[in-house]
């Protein structure tokens, strides 16, 4: 499917659409309300092509839908105002009625790095703003040319973002191929929606059970290594943050995971006697779903998730072997693209399980997974602290950073191995040269910004 990057600008008496040539993305084409037979040209452009832009679901595709329904410039201007200024949902075009009329991919989906202008700034591109009011009537030819230049600049920026996010697009294409999902559907979907499609999730309504049940196989370990006042915090599922002091850390347990620090401001490094050791759980949330049955109950065949996990491991292994023998060959590119696509599914499932608008939504499973994950890490950290005397520098969602005497490293590994055997998880260890962290608190209601750095000099896999 050919890709066409486009952008639209709307004024009371005139509109323009700038788009890339379907055969040469470096060339820009322009259609305006002044263009003879503009509707025919737009209708000829659309079929069998994927329209790509930034936040086009929220704006440009709604405008384009208005155009193909013969809206005149002023009607489009009213629609533009309804979208941008008033959020008027009564406008019949300010909605998703365009969805099945176009093939498209919105680069705003799953994007976490700000606006298109911020992207332009981050890549060193000049930022162009139009000084012409969007409410201006009677545009001169010079003003129209200026608007077109501005629009072309945004299209060029979007082309660069497309290059930057090529792997994102390619993963959707690959998942479409691997799981027999229509390409147009895959490209339109967010990662979370695509994940639900791959796993064939069917939404179900359930009464939320707020009682958290500790799995039997780890209950004894948790009760032995966490004090009762910590265990009791997890009796009922809720979104409240829970702050406690344990292993000389201030710990925050929250729905986003565990976070703790030894000190707000710290600089520490490895030396001849002590070493900084970081231990992380491999694919923590995916493994919690598989080994403790925390996958969304909306998935009819839970084994499919584990099959995807195992297939990804095998494809990654094959890709690494191919790279060693033949470098980044065409075979390697395909294997790597396949494993990256499957990684997207594995890493997106948990977040989708928390999204009430997603077919995977299962609040009980998502919250239970998060609770158990935090408790298991806290219990391991506390056991290392109490048994070995190591300093716990920090904990995070899937790992623990400790400072320990070098001659006690094997003692730490024994406790890690015990934890791995109990849970079925695997931990990876890294040795850190230096770690420093500062926490800035701003205002009376402290907004905390954490700055931290660490330097790794070698990595070893355990387990």
What are these regions (language model features)?
Residues 26-463:
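Conserved acidic
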């Amino acid at each position: 499917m050919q890709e066409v990057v486009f952008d639209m600008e709307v004024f009371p008496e005139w509109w323009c659409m700038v788009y890339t040539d379907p055969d040469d993305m470096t060339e820009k084409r322009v259609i305006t309300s002044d263009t003879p037979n503009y509707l025919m040209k737009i209708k000829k452009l659309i079929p069998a092509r994927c329209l790509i832009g930034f936040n086009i679901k929220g704006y440009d595709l709604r405008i384009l839908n208005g155009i193909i329904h013969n809206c005149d410039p002023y009607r489009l201007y009213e629609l533009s105002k309804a979208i941008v200024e008033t959020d008027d949902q009564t406008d019949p075009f300010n909605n998703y009625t365009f969805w099945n009329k176009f093939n498209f991919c919105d680069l705003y989906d799953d994007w976490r790095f700000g606006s298109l202008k911020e992207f332009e700034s981050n890549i060193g591109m000049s930022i162009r703003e139009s000084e012409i009011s969007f409410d201006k009537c009677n545009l001169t030819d010079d003003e129209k040319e200026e608007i077109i230049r501005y629009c072309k600049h945004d299209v060029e920026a979007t082309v660069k973002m497309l290059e930057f996010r090529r792997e994102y697009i390619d993963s959707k294409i690959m998942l479409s191929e691997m799981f027999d999902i229509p390409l147009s559907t895959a490209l339109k979907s967010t990662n979370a929606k695509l994940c639900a499609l791959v796993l064939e999730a069917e939404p179900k309504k359930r009464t939320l059970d707020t009682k958290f049940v500790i799995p039997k196989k780890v209950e004894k370990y948790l009760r032995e290594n966490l004090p009762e006042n910590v265990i009791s915090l997890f009796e009922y599922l809720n979104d409240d943050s829970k702050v406690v002091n344990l292993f000389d850390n201030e710990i925050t347990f929250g729905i986003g995971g565990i976070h703790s620090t030894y000190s707000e401001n710290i600089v520490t490094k490895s030396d001849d006697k002590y070493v900084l050791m970081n231990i992380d759980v491999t694919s923590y949330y995916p493994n919690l779903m598989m080994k403790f049955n925390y996958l969304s109950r909306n998935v009819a065949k839970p084994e499919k998730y584990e099959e995807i996990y195992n297939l990804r491991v095998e494809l990654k292994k094959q890709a690494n072997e191919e790279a060693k023998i033949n470098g980044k060959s065409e075979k390697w590119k395909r294997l790597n693209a396949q494993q990256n696509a499957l990684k997207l599914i594995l890493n997106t499932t948990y977040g989708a399980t928390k999204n009430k608008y997603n077919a995977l939504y299962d609040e009980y499973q998502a919250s239970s997974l998060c609770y158990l994950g935090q408790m298991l890490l806290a219990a391991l950290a506390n056991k290392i602290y109490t048994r070995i005397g190591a300093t716990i520098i920090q904990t995070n969602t899937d790992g623990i950073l400790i400072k320990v005497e070098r001659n006690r490293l094997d003692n730490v590994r024994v406790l890690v191995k015990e934890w791995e055997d109990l849970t079925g998880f695997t931990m990876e260890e890294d040795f850190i040269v230096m770690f420093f962290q500062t926490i800035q608190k701003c205002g009376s209601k402290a907004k905390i910004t954490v700055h931290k750095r660490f330097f790794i000099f070698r990595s070893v896999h355990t387990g």
